[in-house]
Amino acid sequence: STTKGLAAVCLLQLVEEGKVNLDDPVAKYWPEFAQNGKEKIPVRYLFCHKSGLCGVTTPLPNDAYYNWDIMVEALAAQKPQWEPGTRHGYHALTYGHLIGEMVRRVSGKTIGNYFNEKIAEPLNLDFWIGLPDDQFEKVTDIQPSFFPLWTRLLAPAFKIIPKGMLRGDLAMIKDFDDPSTIAGSAFNNPRMEIKNPFYANSREWRKAEIPAANGHGSARAIAKFYGVLSNGGERDGVHILDKKTI
């Protein structure tokens, strides 16, 4: 999720340049987004997890995160899960596609290419959104947590139990298996961990541009990036954002 901040700065640069207005409807830049009552959602709601699009309730193929068009088309068609602006809900993975599609619509570049050109290269950051082949040897595997996997495996067993009889974690486990729920749509659609709990070590995951979750880089690069933001938005003559934007 550290990648979310890097993705957000890409779109904020376009705001700073006057190419995007935070109070304009998203649909002004992304017309298909207006479906299902979303025509008035302002750009600023995408930044602060208030758009009501924390997940997709239509079941998605397991490899949907590796196909940008599938994800953004699903989000464009999705009905908000609450009235936009009235509630906050963590957009665990969709955050990156919402921000990233705005960047693509306005700049004409994928967010990975935009980030590399406008931020990573100027600051000499060893960080990527969508890992190139020649960087694979620098990446170490991660060890997955099996708790999320077990909750998903157990979820079908809870289908026969009325939800009102379950509390706390047990109710959450039941929701995980149902993409029509907020928890299920946000964290288990597509069902990647069922297919492969080691998916984050796969070639497909590393090469994909998933701006909310799969940036690859060094701790030094992350520290440098956020250090620039915390010290006014400029370093060594490289301008990232104005202080007022930060």
Located regions from the model:
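Penicillin-binding protein/beta-lactamase superfamily catalytic region
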Residues: 133-246
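Flexible glycine/proline-enriched surface loops and loop-helix/loop-strand junctions
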Residues: 78-85, 95-97, 202-211
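Hydrophobic (often cysteine-bearing) scaffold residues that line and stabilize catalytic clefts
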Residues: 2-3, 7, 91, 95, ...
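Active-site helix/loop module of the DD-peptidase/beta-lactamase fold
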Residues: 2, 16-54, 58, 77, ...
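A glycine-rich, coil/turn loop motif that links secondary-structure elements
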Residues: 32-40, 87-92, 215
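Short glycine/serine- and small hydrophobic-enriched flexible loop segments
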Residues: 12-17, 97-105, 224-231
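Generic alpha-helical structural context detector
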Residues: 44-48, 73, 224-227
